[in-house]
Amino acid sequence: MSSGEPTTMTPSPSERTPLLSNGSGGAADDGGTTVTISKPNDGVRRIADSLPLSVWLISTIELCERFAYFGTIAPMQNYIQNPRNDPLRPGGIGKTASTMIYPAV
């Protein structure tokens, strides 16, 4: 070793840097050195913002539409399945199933 030749020491497998570091946000390249990987939005502040009025308006209208649909589907099913002039099962306003559920008429 006194000849002045450069020596390279290869680390033993137990001394190498792990491929995935624990929580440091870096990764090891082939040489064993750690390279820091950053995400594109790491430096951007996160600020909570309110939703625009148009989003609230569309959501409210769609919710009302769903309530109206599911609220009318049961009476409409009665009117569609049972014809008006059927003597066995008078449907519609023939005063059977719909007036038993909703005694308003």
UniProtKB/Swiss-Prot annotation:
Bias class Polar residues marks the residues at: 1-15
Could you tell me the superkingdom of the organism this chain comes from?
Eukaryota
What are the boundaries of the region Disordered?
Answer: 1-43
Pathway connected to this protein: Secondary metabolite biosynthesis
Q: What induces it?
A: Expression is down-regulated by ralstonins, lipopeptides produced by the plant pathogenic bacteria Ralstonia solanacearum. Expression is positively regulated by the imizoquins cluster-specific transcription regulator imqK.
* Entry function: Part of the gene cluster that mediates the biosynthesis of imizoquins A to D, tripeptide-derived alkaloids that serve a protective role against oxidative stress that are essential for normal germination. ImqB is a canonical three-module NRPS that assembles the tripeptide backbone of the imizoquins via condensation of Trp, Tyr, and Leu-derived precursors. N-methylation by imqF and phenol oxidation by imqC, followed by cyclization via the FAD-dependent oxidase imqH carry out the three-step transformation of L-tyrosine into tetrahydroisoquinoline.
Q: What is this protein called?
A: Imizoquin biosynthesis cluster protein I
Per the UniProt record, the source organism is: Aspergillus flavus (strain ATCC 200026 / FGSC A1120 / IAM 13836 / NRRL 3357 / JCM 12722 / SRRC 167)
Gene name, Swiss-Prot/TrEMBL:
imqI
